[in-house]
């Protein structure tokens, strides 16, 4: 590995293909915490109607039901490296926009010749057309710059019949092109005699009967899809289907209603047990177990080991083996049959894998949480979920039940020992963990109520500080409303986009199940046919102090692995005045083959923009005359040499 300095420039190695500032999946991570704890720009002090608001709108060709995803420093074909937001629509389109300026880079339609998006299948839940509904997932390790995985529904109208398609697509982030082997038709079968069986002992996946409402999950090189019905229109069952990211070969299949039997008047044909979660995706823990909530449907007679003999799991909190997709544990409310009959299914919500917690006795517990229409928050011990209690009329077999009282159509968020839930026609509530137990009543709540379907909050912070809870409201006025609250106290609303006069921050009609994406100083919130991009308005730029500093580097040959290297980088104040922090070393003009590993952000205001920087602020907050501040910076490069120009910015202004 060779290094050379160019006039005020260094030749270093650059970064990881996956950066801390990416949002590559639903609710930020496979645990589905909804937390971005690397947000350095947006803090409670500057998120208000004077400093924060709508920057621009990204117009698209259909409804946006999927969460926008953010990819930093991605190599766009013919353009170079840019921060990009990916938007998918129900018109079967995928867009890549510049996340900082709104410039469109590419747009692809996933419709084959003579095809159109699916009709709504006689169901108004996703309407007027069905295309891409579930949030995609992005993997950067699969190539340079990476790959987007998503499911698209379409139809071909023939003279006598209409053929429906569900296809898994893998698209290059560089230009939206299909990667080798993409797309593949979604097909599956499962042993059973339940709804949709072929009369020969197998239930068949019929693409016309399903929609991919749940977000996709990526785990251990497998992309998992999970399937829901159209308005409970029979026949349908509960499918999870997994595909290998490289070959797109189907490698996992699970059906949790393979032998569905009528269990109530509400389910006359026994259909049910689907996965929809109001757009939430399956979650996964650090041990590789998957978690999900099923909707209304039959729950089978138990065998001696406590599992349903027929494999039917209605209204159930499932734990699945990633190796086989077998159900290895579960929790089902004792009154499951009544819940199914009353359409108060557990499957309207999503699961969240919580960090390890200590109880009052010092025991470390491994928890997950989920809630649905019945108004209860269920906390399960992932090691002993509790199965179902048929002996007594209670849920004493589960770790903890907290009565929320609000129906949940969405997912919670977790931050700093707190859980945030937003139910239907209810306030957004904060609950707090203590000694491994959740508070039985809210510790704070918003002053405004959210109508249908409630809200799925997201949180931004810098570590455990500067927490902001973001919540999307599908307002009764028909307009979309973005709210921001202090994560310390939800009664403190920092901002909502109706506060500014003259509709300055209006960004479109509201939509249900929308999750805001917060990354790198921006908030992306979908409306019916666009995505609003919010950020700081009147910005004070940081000062360029490069002329008053000296930047040195020293390679550490002992700390090298393949193309990775550790470099000691020093910034010395050679001027006559103290330099007040924050102080940032910016890596300008990086060649396209290079990355900076784990930067603290990228420039959005001080030109040139889009350059990554590393924080060099001393502990005292300022760099005194002749003082030197040193960091070990890791780099990676696809070439032998990497060139950049160092730039040093100082002060509290925006980079």
Spans of features found by a protein language model:
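Short aromatic-acidic-glycine turn motif
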Residues: 587-608
């Amino acid at each position: 590995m060779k290094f050379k300095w160019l006039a005020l420039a260094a030749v270093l190695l650059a970064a990881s293909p996956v950066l801390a500032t990416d949002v590559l999946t639903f609710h930020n991570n496979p645990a589905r915490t909804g937390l971005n704890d690397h947000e350095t720009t947006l803090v409670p002090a500057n998120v208000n109607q004077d400093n924060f608001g709508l920057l621009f709108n990204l117009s698209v060709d259909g409804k946006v039901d999927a969460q926008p995803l953010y990819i930093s420093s991605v190599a766009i074909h013919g353009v170079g490296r840019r921060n990009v937001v990916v938007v998918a629509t129900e018109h079967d389109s995928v867009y890549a926009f510049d996340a900082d300026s709104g410039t469109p880079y590419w747009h692809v339609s996933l419709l084959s010749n003579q095809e159109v998006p699916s009709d709504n299948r006689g169901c108004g839940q996703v309407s007027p057309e069905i295309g891409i509904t579930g949030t995609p997932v992005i993997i950067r390790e699969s190539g340079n710059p990476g790959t987007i995985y998503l499911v698209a529904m379409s139809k071909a109208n023939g003279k006598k019949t209409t053929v429906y398609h569900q296809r898994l697509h893998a698209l290059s982030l560089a230009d939206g092109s299909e990667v080798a082997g993409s797309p593949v038709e979604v097909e599956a079968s499962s042993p059973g005699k339940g709804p949709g069986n072929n009369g020969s002992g197998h239930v068949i996946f019929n693409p016309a009967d399903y929609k991919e409402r749940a977000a996709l999950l990526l785990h251990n090189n497998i992309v998992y899809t999970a399937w829901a019905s159209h308005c409970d229109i029979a026949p349908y069952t509960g499918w999870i289907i997994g595909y290998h990211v490289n070959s797109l070969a189907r490698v996992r299949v699970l059906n949790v209603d393979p032998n569905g039997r009528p269990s109530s008047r509400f389910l006359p044909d026994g259909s049910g047990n689907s996965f929809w979660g109001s757009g939430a995706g399956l979650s996964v823990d650090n041990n590789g177990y998957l978690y999900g909530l099923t909707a209304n449907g039959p729950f089978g007679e138990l065998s001696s080991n406590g599992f349903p003999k027929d494999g039917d799991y209605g209204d159930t909190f499932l734990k699945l083996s990633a190796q086989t997709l077998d159900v290895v544990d579960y929790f089902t409310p004792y009154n499951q049959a009544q819940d199914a009959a009353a359409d108060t299914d557990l499957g309207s919500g999503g699961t969240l894998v919580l960090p390890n917690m200590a109880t009052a006795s010092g025991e470390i517990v491994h928890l997950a949480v989920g809630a649905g229409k019945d108004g209860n928050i269920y906390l399960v011990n992932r090691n002993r979920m509790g199965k179902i209690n048929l002996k007594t009329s209670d849920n004493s077999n589960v770790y903890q039940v907290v009565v929320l009282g609000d129906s949940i159509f969405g997912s919670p968020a977790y931050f700093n020992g707190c859980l945030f839930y937003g139910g239907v026609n209810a306030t957004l509530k904060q609950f707090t963990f203590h000694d491994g137990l959740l508070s039985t009543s809210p510790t704070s709540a918003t002053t405004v109520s959210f109508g249908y379907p409630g809200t799925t909050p997201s949180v931004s912070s810098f570590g455990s500080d500067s927490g902001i809870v973001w919540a999307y409201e599908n307002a009764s006025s028909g307009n979309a409303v973005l709210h921001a609250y202090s994560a310390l106290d939800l009664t403190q609303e920092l901002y909502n986009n109706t506060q500014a006069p003259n509709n300055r921050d209006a960004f479109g009609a509201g939509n249900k199940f929308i999750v805001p994406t917060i990354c790198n100083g921006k908030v992306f919130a979908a409306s019916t046919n666009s995505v609003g991009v919010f950020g700081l308005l009147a910005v004070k730029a940081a000062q360029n102090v490069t002329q008053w500093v000296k930047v040195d580097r020293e390679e550490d040959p002992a700390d090298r692995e393949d193309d990775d290297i550790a470099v000691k980088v020093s910034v010395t104040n050679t001027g006559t005045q103290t330099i007040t922090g924050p102080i940032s070393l910016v890596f300008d003009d990086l060649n396209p083959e290079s990355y900076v590993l784990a930067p603290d952000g990228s420039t959005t205001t001080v030109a040139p923009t889009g350059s990554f920087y590393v924080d060099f602020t001393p502990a005292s907050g300022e760099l005194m005359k002749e003082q030197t501040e040193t960091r070990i910076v890791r780099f990676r490069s696809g070439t032998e040499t990497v060139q950049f120009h160092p730039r040093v910015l100082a002060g509290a202004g925006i980079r």
